[in-house]
C-alpha cells in the first residue's frame, strides 16, 4: 500500500546539516585516512586532482584558512538531530515501513554540460540537484538503498527506499 507522507521542515533542516557536516567530515576523515593508509598522497594533492567542475569549485576552499570552524560543525550536528526527529515523526505518524522516491530527479548529463542543470525550469548546481533526494536520509543516518528501475531516454534510473532509524 502506498501512502503519501509529508516531511515538513525537511529541506530546511537538511540544508542546515548537509554541507557543513559532509564537508567538515570529509576534510577531517580523508586527511586521517590518507595518513593511516600511507599512500604517499596528501589531502591537498588529492583535492588538486579533483576534475569534476562542480566539486573542484567547492573543495579547495575547505583547506587552510578556509577550513570550517568546529562551532559551525557543532551547529550542523544540532540541525541533524532536528532532521532525525522529522523522519522519526513521519514514520511514527504514517506507519509506513519505508519511504519510496526516485533516487535522482534527473538522468545523467553529458560531461562538459554538467556544471549546472535545469530542474523544473530552474537552473542550479549539478551536485546539489543530484543529491537532493538522497541527501536528507543520508544526513539523518537512516538506512537506505537504491535499486535499478530501468531506463529513461536510454539512461539508468533508480528507486530509493529509506527506512526508520535502526531498522536496518
Features from the language model and the residues they span:
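Acidic/polar loop patches that form or flank catalytic/metal-binding clefts of enzymes
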Residues: 2-6, 40-44, 98, 145
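Short alpha-helical interface elements
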Residues: 19-21, 27, 54-62, 112-116, ...
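Short, functional N-terminal and low-complexity linear motifs
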Residues: 1, 12-16, 53-57, 99-104, ...
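Gly/Ser-rich, acidic/histidine-flanked active-site/gating loops
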Residues: 1-39
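Short helix-loop capping/hinge segments that flank enzyme active sites or metal/cofactor-binding pockets
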Residues: 24-85, 106, 148-156
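Glycine-rich, small-residue loops and helix-cap segments
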Residues: 67-168
Amino acid at each position: 500500500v502506498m501512502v503519501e507522507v509529508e516531511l515538513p521542515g525537511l529541506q530546511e533542516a537538511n540544508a542546515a546539516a548537509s554541507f557543513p557536516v559532509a564537508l567538515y567530515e570529509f576534510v577531517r576523515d580523508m586527511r586521517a585516512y590518507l595518513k593511516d593508509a600511507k599512500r604517499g598522497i596528501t589531502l591537498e594533492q588529492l583535492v588538486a586532482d579533483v576534475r569534476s567542475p562542480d566539486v573542484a569549485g567547492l573543495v579547495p576552499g575547505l583547506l587552510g584558512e578556509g577550513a570550517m570552524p568546529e562551532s559551525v560543525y557543532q551547529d550542523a550536528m544540532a540541525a541533524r538531530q532536528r532532521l532525525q526527529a522529522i523522519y522519526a515523526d513521519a514514520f511514527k505518524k504514517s506507519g509506513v515501513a519505508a519511504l519510496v522516491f526516485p533516487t535522482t530527479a534527473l538522468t545523467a548529463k553529458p560531461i562538459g554540460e554538467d556544471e549546472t542543470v535545469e530542474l523544473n525550469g530552474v537552473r542550479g548546481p549539478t551536485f546539489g540537484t543530484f543529491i537532493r533526494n538522497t541527501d536528507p536520509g543520508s544526513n539523518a543516518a537512516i538506512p537506505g538503498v537504491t535499486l535499478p528501475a530501468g531506463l529513461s531516454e536510454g539512461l539508468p534510473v533508480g528507486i530509493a527506499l529509506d527506512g526508520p532509524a535502526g531498522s536496518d
